[in-house]
């Protein structure tokens, strides 16, 4: 079960904000995925998909473990 709520999230390393649109399943593996949209101009893409486990994992920043994405406000 995916516990990621729709809303606005901030990327802990890069600082950009993203709107989580929802969750999905990979068509071949059924791996849970998060579908999200950059809230800034991005020349590569506005829509992104990331494995849910990776979206929720902790990353190291300045020697501290913090969530990769932090919920700023719920939808």
Give names to the regions the model predicted.
Residues 1-75:
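Mixed-charge, low-complexity intrinsically disordered regions
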């Amino acid at each position: 079960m995916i516990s990621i709520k729709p809303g606005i999230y901030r990327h802990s390393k890069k600082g950009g904000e993203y709107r989580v649109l929802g969750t999905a399943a990979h068509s071949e593996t059924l791996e849970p995925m998060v579908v999200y949209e950059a809230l800034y101009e991005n020349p590569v893409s506005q829509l992104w998909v990331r494995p849910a486990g990776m979206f929720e994992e902790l990353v190291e920043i300045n020697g501290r473990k913090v969530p990769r994405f932090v919920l700023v406000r719920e939808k």
